[in-house]
């Protein structure tokens, strides 16, 4: 009988834990502003599994996913758009994409963008 530890979900959870230990600079900056309900009292989770994906940040009560897009995402527009549609269809979430350069250059501007999606 296969072990539950061999399941794809377990692998994603393990990977998400590892990703939390080594955030990108922009993810680290944004997490500092979001953690412990610091931004508008909203609870965010980081590197959260929404099977089959791991999202950068997730606000469950608002059903909002926040993705910080760095250089890796610049040529992945179609793939990212399909992923966003999957997340919306399967989980009923909205996806906000924020450029990593904006987070690093002007965190307050990035938070204003995010705030515009929180209502």
Where do the language-model regions lie?
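Solvent-exposed, charged helical/coil patches
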Residues: 1-42, 102, 118-119
């Amino acid at each position: 009988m296969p072990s539950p530890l061999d399941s794809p979900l377990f692998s994603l959870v393990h990977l998400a834990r590892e990703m939390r230990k080594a955030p990108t600079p922009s993810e680290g900056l944004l997490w500092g502003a979001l953690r412990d309900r610091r931004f508008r009292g909203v609870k965010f989770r980081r590197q959260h599994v929404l099977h089959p994906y791991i999202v950068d940040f997730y606000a469950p009560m608002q059903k909002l996913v926040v993705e910080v897009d760095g250089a890796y995402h610049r040529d992945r527009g179609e793939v990212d758009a399909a992923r966003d549609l999957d997340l919306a269809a399967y989980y009923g979430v909205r996806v906000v994409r924020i450029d990593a350069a904006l987070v690093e250059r002007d965190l307050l501007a990035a938070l204003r963008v995010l705030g515009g999606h929180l209502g």
